Amino acid sequence: ISNFIENYSDFKGSISLLITGDEEGVAINGTKKVVEYLKKRKEKIDFCLVGEPTNPSKLGEMIKIGRRGSMNGRLTITGVQGHVAYPQRANNPSTALVQILKEIKDIKFDQGTKDFQATNLEITKININNTADNVIPGFATATFNIRFNNKHSSTSLKSKVNKVIKKISAKNKSKYKIEYSVSGEAFLTNPNKTTFMIQDIIKKITKIKPKLSTTGGTSDARFIRKIAPCLEFGLVGKTMHKVDEAVSLSDLKKLTLIYSNILKNYFK
């Protein structure tokens, strides 16, 4: 930005930079709060470039034009504890839990779209918390995550999953509690002249034409897209969250040049 302003100080418009340390997981006090503040101020943002590490292995491979939604579910089934020798006096919650998990895992939500992978559910935890081998537990819990495309909303998916939980719990005469947390809804920024301008700049500098993609996890674009169209492009994410996380200095220099050229072309 400083390089751009130094060379093009008479450009028409404004540039804002947002850096946050609260962008993983629930992300309460970072971009989300800033977006809420900007909405209250009725601030108009024309475009946003998010500096996520979008490239799998080489700089220039990928631009993110959207993201899948992400929703976690925590399910607790309550039965009746008892001795394994007298199952008629108990109600094993793990029976209902296993049946529910199998049925929701087997749901074919969709076949994907031209922009998104198929919606997918993964079971992430199963906990019966029973230290005795001869006791039927009183409760059992599990958590699952759904990564979903823009054919669904978190609300529609909750309804679909809840039907299965309700049906199998009733069949097994078990009580249940289901809690959901939504990290973000699926969204897509339709490619336009800005998208293709950025794609051309990246190709010119890296000699690679970047793929327009929606793969991967969530990012802060999930908040920004509520107030502005946005794309994501940054460094290579090959070592992110690993021991000895690192980036190439050569890539860093190229990325600086890419960003500088994007600003130059955007404000033409």
Q: What does each model-identified segment do?
A:
Residues I1-G66:
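Acidic/histidine-rich catalytic neighborhood of metal-dependent amide-processing enzymes
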